[in-house]
UniProtKB/Swiss-Prot annotation:
Residues 253-255 are annotated as: GPR motif. Pfam families: VP7. It is found in: Virion; Host endoplasmic reticulum lumen. N-glycosylated. The N-terminus is blocked possibly by pyroglutamic acid. InterPro entries: VP7 (IPR001963), VP7_1 (IPR042207), VP7_2 (IPR042210). GO terms for cellular component: host cell endoplasmic reticulum lumen; T=13 icosahedral viral capsid; viral outer capsid. This is Outer capsid glycoprotein VP7. One of its GO terms (molecular function) is metal ion binding. It comes from Rotavirus A (strain RVA/Human/Philippines/L26/1987/G12P1B[4]) (RV-A). Residues 165-167 are annotated as: CNP motif. Calcium-binding protein that interacts with rotavirus cell receptors once the initial attachment by VP4 has been achieved. Rotavirus attachment and entry into the host cell probably involves multiple sequential contacts between the outer capsid proteins VP4 and VP7, and the cell receptors. Following entry into the host cell, low intracellular or intravesicular Ca(2+) concentration probably causes the calcium-stabilized VP7 trimers to dissociate from the virion. This step is probably necessary for the membrane-disrupting entry step and the release of VP4, which is locked onto the virion by VP7. Homotrimer; disulfide-linked. 2 Ca(2+) ions bound at each subunit interface in the trimer hold the trimer together. Interacts with the intermediate capsid protein VP6. Interacts with the outer capsid protein VP5*.
Length: 326
């Protein structure tokens, strides 16, 4: 009997010790699993973006989002305005503080003096190919000059729109334009551009590919040329390479925060786009030639009307181009 009791007690003690060992083993295993999971979580956490409610937008002088134009009720306290003008302005206006004077005048129209910037350019053709536009609203003054041999409508097309361009090797390759937004832009001291359309067998249509004299001339001795040909047709191109460069460009869309004011020649009478007589619905104006002070006074006086048809730092593909003439 005593042997049975001792055996029972011993069995119970062994069971208790074994159970205690099993529980400790399970506890240690759970601790190992939990700590390892926490370690992995801490390591991976910096690489996890749990809340990503937006996308990265490329900014090239404008945000690729259309903004509702609310300038009519805006005090412009948070907006910036850049006025671009030719270097010839400082030849006529000798006052070293002329920009300060204009800043004070813009202040009377609701533009703080630290929000208006004046920037000069030497060559409108070079400026138009790669304009550096820094402000919420950008106004470019273009002076009319017959001697420049420039088509102002082509300048406006370049400045008022964003372009993606790549160089062309017309000596080795044929080129075709894919759609209406695809243009060939030539620029230089003297650009003469000739083209020869090709059929499916790369034979000239109305021209001979080996005889430049048979090519169709689309531009002669111009400083800036935007060539538009029939889409989807290969072309052999001839250009005065020693005085001109050519690029294959794609129009991305309008810069809605940019306006052009063309300062016309003294022999031109045109009030069709004058902001002083016609309410503006586009971003293109004209002011017939006056002294530069009078031009700037006109711009200041009508600045808030001008920006009504612009969009602050916006580039909407559905909006019309904008060009003013003074």
């Amino acid at each position: 009997m005593y042997g049975i009791e001792y055996t029972t007690i011993l069995t119970i003690l062994i069971s208790i010790v074994l159970l205690n060992y099993i529980l400790k083993s399970i506890t240690s295993m759970m601790d190992f699993i939990i700590y390892r999971f926490l370690l992995v979580f801490v390591i991976v956490l910096p690489f996890i973006k749990a809340q990503n409610y937006g996308i990265n937008l490329p900014i090239t002088g404008s945000m690729d989002t259309a903004y509702v134009n609310s300038t009519q009720q805006e005090s412009f306290m948070t907006s910036t305005l850049c006025l671009y003008y030719p270097n010839s302005v400082t030849t006529e206006i000798t006052d070293p503080d002329w920009t300060h004077t204009l800043s004070q005048l813009f202040l009377t129209k609701g533009w703080p003096t630290n929000s208006v910037y004046f920037k000069s350019y030497a060559d409108i053709a070079s400026f138009s190919v790669n304009p550096q536009l820094y402000c919420d609203y950008n106004i470019v003054l273009v002076q009319y000059q017959n001697s420049l041999a420039l088509d102002v409508s082509e300048l406006a097309d370049l400045i008022l729109n964003e372009w993606l361009c790549n160089p062309m090797d017309v000596t080795l390759y044929y080129y075709q334009q894919t759609d209406e937004a695809n243009k060939w832009i030539s620029m230089g001291d003297s650009c003469t551009v000739k083209v020869c359309p090709l059929n499916m067998q790369t034979l000239g249509i109305g021209c001979t590919t080996t005889d430049v004299a048979t090519f169709e001339e689309v531009a002669n001795a111009e400083k800036l040329v935007i060539t538009d040909v029939v889409d989807g047709v290969n072309h052999k191109i001839n250009i005065t390479l020693n005085t001109c460069t050519i690029q294959n460009c794609k129009k991305l869309g309008p810069r809605e925060n940019v306006a052009i004011i063309q300062v016309g020649g003294s022999d031109i009478i045109d009030i069709t786009a004058d902001p002083t007589t016609i309410p503006q619905t586009e971003r293109i104006m004209r002011i017939n030639w006056k002294k530069w002070w009078q031009v700037f006074y006109t711009v200041v006086d009508y600045i808030n009307q001008i920006v009504q048809v612009m969009s602050k730092r916006s580039r909407s593909l559905n909006s019309a181009a904008f060009y003013y003439r003074i």
